[in-house]
A protein has these predicted regions:
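Bacterial N-terminal signal peptides that target proteins for export
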Residues: 1-8
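Bacterial N-terminal signal peptides
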Residues: 8-17
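Sec/Tat signal peptide C-region and signal peptidase I cleavage site
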Residues: 18-22
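OB-fold and OB-like single-stranded nucleic-acid-recognition modules
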Residues: 23-289
Length: 289
């Protein structure tokens, strides 16, 4: 279902501040620190400034922390915004990455597969050129249930924005003409055929607002950021690639995602952009009204 439908007609270790020429090996530098990451209790963490960058793996209010510490470590990276992407990911690349998801990784075993995943490019900076299908403020959709990567904080400024990036120009045109309500509990084509990109609360530009993002729905975009496998979602309930049902409750086309987003660009009006388009054909989200 996934392969046929999403094609369409067509003290945090700041690894991210490496110079562009060195970032290709960023993946293995991150992986070399996987075994030293631990899940911890939040203690007196009360605000986003207490969480990032002081808690590199986030934390939990549980007295017995069991979350995937290396996964959170990756989520909480702060890559420099000017890092040059090492490649562009399209449909074929995401299908290939799905095929490489290690058996047995489960929800909490990212560390065991860190080197293998780094070999697939996890941790390197990549670009995705597609269309913005949906925007989700997880503060609202989670009913302010905080994630461990953000120290289980429940404040409005402590939640990620989820973006659905798809590849079907016809569906994108429909969304642009008549943007449907995004309902993660009732996923449709826009959710099931898109890859997820996440803007994290401590790395996103102040002008990357939900309102400004929603004005770009259906438009051609280029998203730049860290490639990461969110192994929590590598299952039949979440990842449509794991499901054989033509229609089901799965809500994403891949467990691989861009997280965090470092750049978000929109194709200029009157242009038809591609991965080879010059910078002059794109405009940064923060420069748009």
């Amino acid at each position: 279902m996934f392969r046929a439908s999403w094609l369409g007609p067509v003290a945090l270790l700041l690894i991210g501040v490496l110079p562009a020429r060195a970032q290709d090996d960023r993946a293995h530098q991150l992986a070399s620190h996987a075994s030293s990451q631990t899940a911890v209790n939040c203690g007196d963490v009360a605000a986003l400034a207490d969480c990032h960058p002081a808690m590199p793996t986030g934390c939990t209010n549980s007295l017995h922390p069991r979350y995937d510490a290396y996964l959170n470590f990756l989520k909480n990276q702060q890559p420099d915004r000017d890092l040059t992407p090492s490649g562009v990911l399209g449909v074929d690349e995401f299908i290939s990455l799905e095929d490489k998801i290690p058996t047995g990784i489960g929800r909490t075993h990212h560390t065991q597969f860190a080197d293998q995943l780094a070999g697939f490019g996890e941790g390197n900076i990549h670009a995705v050129v597609g269309f913005l299908y949906f925007v989700e403020n997880t503060a609202i959709t989670s009913q302010h249930r905080g994630e461990t990567c953000n120290c289980q904080l429940r404040k409005n400024d402590s939640f990620d924005f989820h973006l659905g990036i798809g590849f079907d120009p016809a569906l994108a045109q429909e969304i642009r003409n008549n943007p449907p309500v995004h309902d993660p509990k009732n996923p449709r084509a826009a959710e099931q055929t898109s890859v997820v990109a996440e803007m994290t609360p401590h790395t996103r530009d102040l002008k990357w607002t939900v309102a400004r993002l929603n004005r770009q729905r259906g438009k051609q975009v280029k998203v730049v950021g860290q490639l990461m496998l969110d192994n929590v979602h590598a299952n039949t309930n979440d990842d449509c690639e794991f499901s054989d049902e033509a229609e089901g409750s799965c809500w994403r086309a891949s467990a691989w995602e861009i997280h965090p987003v470092t750049q978000f660009l929109v194709c200029k009006t009157g242009k038809t952009c591609s991965s080879d388009s010059p910078d002059s054909d794109w405009v940064r989200l923060e420069d748009l009204p």
